[in-house]
């Protein structure tokens, strides 16, 4: 934001639009653009539509086509996990056509924590959509309530419910659900997107762009929603 501090607001705005076009927005840039959108006299009906209009359509379609090729359809084992907020979350309670995004992470995993900014952007994007849920599962790590609360407070994470992966019988490794969805690996962060009892998308690692991660998650959600729309016709 150095251009803004120098009073070069037009240049700063153009730079932020460039970041949006390239899929390289940080949460700060995203919020600044939201503020600018509110001042526009002529604009699309929603901020999200305006942001989408800044991105080259051919690049967006290229990314979507790549993601379509990565859509899978693998049944997942039913699970029950303890919630950091209290109570339990059961996969049996997920509704028909509900899309559930699960982010497997750990307190010791720096890339996992770095990716949470992008996941917050995705959570905010679907904050008013009751058909999409997000859960953040502590795996391969003992959940430290004080550290989790401190991390959430420091970064102002909102509406990001933390779950605790289950322990195998006789062990203390907290990886039961993780292992059932990602057999043969132990790498995190991992994302799994679920729908109607099946894993529909999986992704490992973090590319470093918060808005790039938001786009990836939202494009997959759009693809899965389109499936439902086609089925209804």
Task: Please describe what each predicted stretch is.
Residues 155-158, 166-222:
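Thiol/disulfide oxidoreductase modules built on the thioredoxin-like
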Residues 79-100, 121-126:
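A short beta-strand-turn-helix
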Residues 22-82, 95-96, 230:
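N-proximal helix/coil linker or "cap" segments that precede and/or mark the start of modular domains
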Residues 97-100, 104-108, 141:
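Short pre-active-site segment immediately N-terminal to redox-active cysteine/selenocysteine motifs
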Residues 114-157, 168-179:
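Structural microenvironment flanking redox-active thiols in thiol-disulfide oxidoreductases
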């Amino acid at each position: 934001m150095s251009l803004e501090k120098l009073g070069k607001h037009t240049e700063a705005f153009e730079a932020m639009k460039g970041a949006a076009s390239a899929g390289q927005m940080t949460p700060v840039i995203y919020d600044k653009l939201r503020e600018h959108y509110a001042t526009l006299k002529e604009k699309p009906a929603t901020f999200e539509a305006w942001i989408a209009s800044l991105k080259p359509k051919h690049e967006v379609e290229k990314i979507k086509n790549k993601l379509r090729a990565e859509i899978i359809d693998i049944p997942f084992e039913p699970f029950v996990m303890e919630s950091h907020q209290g109570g339990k979350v059961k996969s049996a309670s997920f509704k028909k056509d509900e899309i559930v995004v699960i982010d497997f992470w750990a307190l010791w995993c720096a890339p996992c924590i770095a990716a949470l900014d992008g996941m917050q952007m995705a959570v905010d994007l679907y904050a008013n959509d009751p058909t999409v849920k997000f859960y953040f599962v502590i795996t391969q790590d003992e959940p430290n309530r004080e550290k989790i609360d401190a991390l959430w407070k420091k970064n102002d994470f909102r509406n990001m419910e933390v779950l605790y992966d289950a322990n195998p019988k006789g062990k203390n490794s907290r990886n039961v659900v993780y292992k059932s969805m990602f057999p043969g690996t132990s790498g995190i962060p991992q994302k799994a997107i679920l729908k109607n009892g099946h894993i529909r998308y999986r992704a490992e690692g973090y590319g470093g762009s918060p808005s790039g991660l938001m786009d990836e998650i939202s494009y997959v959600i759009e693809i899965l929603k389109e499936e439902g729309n086609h089925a209804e016709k």
